[in-house]
Amino acid sequence: MMIKYLFATLLLFAGFTPLQAQTVSDPNAPYLKDNKIPPFSITSIDGKEVTNKQMPKYAFTCIIIFSPDCPHCEKEAGEINKYADKFKNVLFIWDSYRDMESIKKFAVKYNLVDKPNVIIGRDPNFTLPTFYRPRMTPFVALYQKGVLLKVYEQGADVFELIKIIEGK
């Protein structure tokens, strides 16, 4: 009887191991070897192509790979929008692999439309997902003057972002 409980316990813990492993960075992800913003081209929700060379200059750049139907992504967008006044010196690049209509609905819902410091759309060449190899969304990469500061594999804590941006 005791062996059955021990075996069941081992199976239970073994079942959780793959879930924990999914949150660890892919050791071959290119961003681990290159700390600069990668070359990319995003089709924004207004149909314009935006590349890394054309993006507006801000002190910080925050690249977020998201899915419009992801609850954690919705929370992230809501928090960033709630504290938008703290992020005036940050360019947000929201990239999704989903269809443009879903991305537009997300942008409207979370007030990400017509903001000078927000680019939201789709990377048709999957350059950003290939560079970061996110295991889940939202995946957040924060840069200062084009150099990688920090990566958040499971979404960023807005208050931590604010502290970094404010230099605290």
Describe each PLM feature range:
Residues Q22-K53:
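N-terminal "domain-start" segment that seeds a small globular fold
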Residues Y143-K168:
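Thiol-/selenol-based redox modules, centered on thioredoxin-like
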Residues M1-P27, K168:
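Bacterial Sec-dependent N-terminal signal peptides
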Residues E74-N111, T127-T130:
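Structural microenvironment flanking redox-active thiols in thiol-disulfide oxidoreductases
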Residues N52-E74, I80:
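Short active-site neighborhood of thiol/selenol oxidoreductases, capturing the structured segment around
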Residues Y110-A141:
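Short, internal strand/loop/helix patches
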Residues I64, I93-D95, I119:
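Structural recognition of the beta-strand scaffold that forms the well-ordered cores
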Residues P38, K88, D114-V118:
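A short helix-to-beta-strand connector/capping loop
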